[in-house]
Amino acid sequence: KSRLYFAVTVLMCAFVSINGVGLNDLLERASQLSDKLHSLSTSLTNDLDSHFPPVGRVMMPRPSMCHTSSLQIPNDKDQALKVPEDELLSLARSLLLAWSDPLALLSSKASSLAHPERNTINSKTKELQDNINSLVPGLEHVVHKMGSSSDNLSSLPFYSNSLGQDKTSRLVNFHFLLSCFRRDSHKIDSFLKVLRCRAAKKRPEMC
């Protein structure tokens, strides 16, 4: 855990002063941060699964209920390789920005979850927030380097400010939101790695 936190902190600091940094390096740093996002969300999911009530599986909403499910995106890497760079970057940014409010909600509720690993879950959720807060401005710099439009984003509003009225509902909805984020973080990571590969002029089969 401490090694992961140190690595994330170093990557965050790398985005603080990036004037003059080339596109390849910016995308490399962004890809490393997005990889950490996905790894951390996977670790959090495993923590939750360690003590998750059987009834929670029944109560869990379907993936199609994720607030980002309406966004039309490539289904796999082969499809992503056919999408123009500026569109792929806009998709990654749209997904990332869509998680600002949901992650703030998760972070505010993690410490009160009815779960024996809530302290660990709380700590990792705050790390997720820190990662997001670093990656968002990092991608803004990528936008400027690529000469893309910074306004070409999809609106994916999140309307809830509660996880539920009872401890089981709160745990289930926390898990559901996290599973949605884990799925989206994988997409963000995949899109940024394709962009990094293209910027490095690699052949598609090498990406």
Curated annotation (Swiss-Prot):
Disulfide bonds join C66-C180, C197-C207. GO terms for molecular function: hormone activity. Residues 1-20 form the signal peptide. Pfam families: Hormone_1 (PF00103). Its main location: secreted. InterPro entries: 4_helix_cytokine-like_core (IPR009079), Somatotropin/Prolactin (IPR001400), Somatotropin_CS (IPR018116). Pituitary gland. GO terms for biological process: positive regulation of cell population proliferation; positive regulation of receptor signaling pathway via JAK-STAT; response to nutrient levels. SUPFAM superfamilies: 4-helical cytokines. GO terms for cellular component: extracellular space. The keyword Ribosomal protein does not apply. Belongs to the somatotropin/prolactin family. This is Prolactin. The gene is prl.
